[in-house]
């Protein structure tokens, strides 16, 4: 009998990615007034011997020699960004996780000619992108695969992606084991007072003409600290991640401000959350060397304070010398960030329990369709147990030192 043929792009839909060793899948979405809309899912390319037929894990298995920990990670980028952080994939796979990254509609791999880069008028629009990705990963709403029901889903978002995933998690808590936020844009740079002053004018502009461009405030300093073409160490596509960022439009900023207002009211997330932030911000109109070792996009003190409104069990890790995207920081800060994530995963994301043998005393004690992995019940129990401790931590977070406030 002939050997089964290895899967190809024609048989699976997956095609070679722009990143060596990775592959991508285009996810068709509902069209909008600019035409065709897609998202793009990215994962490590598997070797030819890993046939798609009988693939119980829906692709993207951990590396050979690494024990499968039973968790799957979906990463979502921030504003004017796309997935290129291969070291992040390396890290999660070394933890025994399957790793996937999503380029949202009108970003990176998903940007089509004639589209307004990054433009939406509601962050809930991304629900369709996220659901399409989760369906491919085996975590869709209608997933009936018992193998996948016992795997935990960890979401990781950077900046605006962190805000988007926080809002999505609050609406879909029964499907999530944990949430990792890399410098999430939970609050406006001028904090809540500035946001509330600005919001009415932005909302009016969004109603009148959501695509009118707003003044450019990105001076390119963050790109200078990150890109190898300048003072940074990373190679990426400057067309997909421009030096001064995409043009900001009123409709998009209005969507962000609405999302931040929702966080301020409290999202009530009951699953464990990890927030990674630099210890300092440098928000200045001129370049300084400190921008190589601090967040030049967000006010980290305001974000740290707002993170207490995410839910009941929030761990805040402040990383000395970290950039806005902490995994693009210099090696010492990057290593510290990864160690914080690894520690959090070990402590807060339980591994699946071994399935009971048929006929054993334990068999039949789990409700049909629930599986032996119960992240939400565990998280809610843990959250209740530490609620008083979290209140104390929140008070300490509001007095966190070591952050540089923006100078006039």
Where are the regions a protein language model picked out?
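N-terminal cap/lid segment of alpha/beta-hydrolase-fold proteins
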Residues: 1-66
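Short, surface-exposed "cap/lid" segments of acyl-processing enzymes
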Residues: 45-104, 111-113, 290
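Short beta-to-alpha linker loops that shape the active-site pocket of alpha/beta-hydrolase fold enzymes
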Residues: 79, 103-108, 185, 320-323
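Alpha/beta-hydrolase active-site loop
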Residues: 119-141
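Alpha/beta-hydrolase fold nucleophile elbow
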Residues: 141-159
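Alpha/beta-hydrolase-fold enzymes
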Residues: 160, 164-248
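Serine-hydrolase catalytic core
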Residues: 215-314, 318
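Catalytic active-site module of serine/aspartate enzymes centered on a nucleophile-bearing elbow/loop
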Residues: 313-408
